[in-house]
Amino acid sequence: MSVKIENIRSELLSKNWFKLHKYTFDLIDDNGTSVQQIREVYDRGNGATILLYNRPNGTVLLINQFRMPTYVNGNPDGMLLETCAGLLDNDSPEECIRREAMEETGYQVDSVQKLFEAYMSPGGVTEIIHFFAAEYHADQKVTDDVGVEDEVIEVVELPFTEAIAMIADGRIKDGKTIMLLQYAQIHGLLK
């Protein structure tokens, strides 16, 4: 099936932190049937995330961070256990994720492996996330001062097997983190 889009009109609804647009357009299917659709689209830019793992120790490095949207949606304290991540801004995905790893974990990682890209919520958000993995070792830790601006972050080192179990029991609920941990499990990054 293929579709054709015509008569696209955009209205800016908000440009506070990110941009929220209302799009009105005609969607035409293979049979030539045209249906007018209206969608709100949130443009927050693209991002990157990374799974930091230590193969000899069988551990992963995650962060516990306050996320207001999770609090609003029933997470009692708003804290979310996740892989470090950030928006690209004007950096390449590789530059972004090295910077974010340093800012959020205190580890300086040089060699990062790009795994894949994914839309995380394509029904309403434009963002593509670039997924990475990298090994970390104790000698790469350069600071205990983590987080920037008003971020509330705790660095958490866990056995990989425990992190996998935390998906099943609901202690890890972040989609990008689940995807990276399962990628590591499927591809044998840690034994």
Swiss-Prot record:
Sites where the protein binds Mg(2+) 2: 100, 104, 151
Pfam families the UniProt entry points to: NUDIX
KW Protein transport (keyword) present: no
GO cellular component, one term: cytosol
Listed EC numbers: 3.6.1.-
Positions annotated to bind Mg(2+) 1: 85, 104
Residues binding GDP-alpha-D-mannose: 38-40, 67, 85-87, 104, 127, 150-151, 176
Cofactor: Mg(2+)
Classification via SUPFAM superfamilies: Nudix
Transmembrane segments: none
Alphabetical UniProt keywords: Hydrolase, Magnesium, Metal-binding
Entry superkingdom: Bacteria
Similarity annotation: Belongs to the Nudix hydrolase family. NudK subfamily.
Subunit comment: Homodimer.
PANTHER family referenced in this protein's UniProt entry, alphabetically: NUDIX HYDROLASE DOMAIN-CONTAINING PROTEIN, UDP/ADP-SUGAR PYROPHOSPHATASE
Name the record gives this protein: GDP-mannose pyrophosphatase
Organism expressing this protein natively: Yersinia enterocolitica serotype O:8 / biotype 1B (strain NCTC 13174 / 8081)
Gene responsible for this protein: nudK
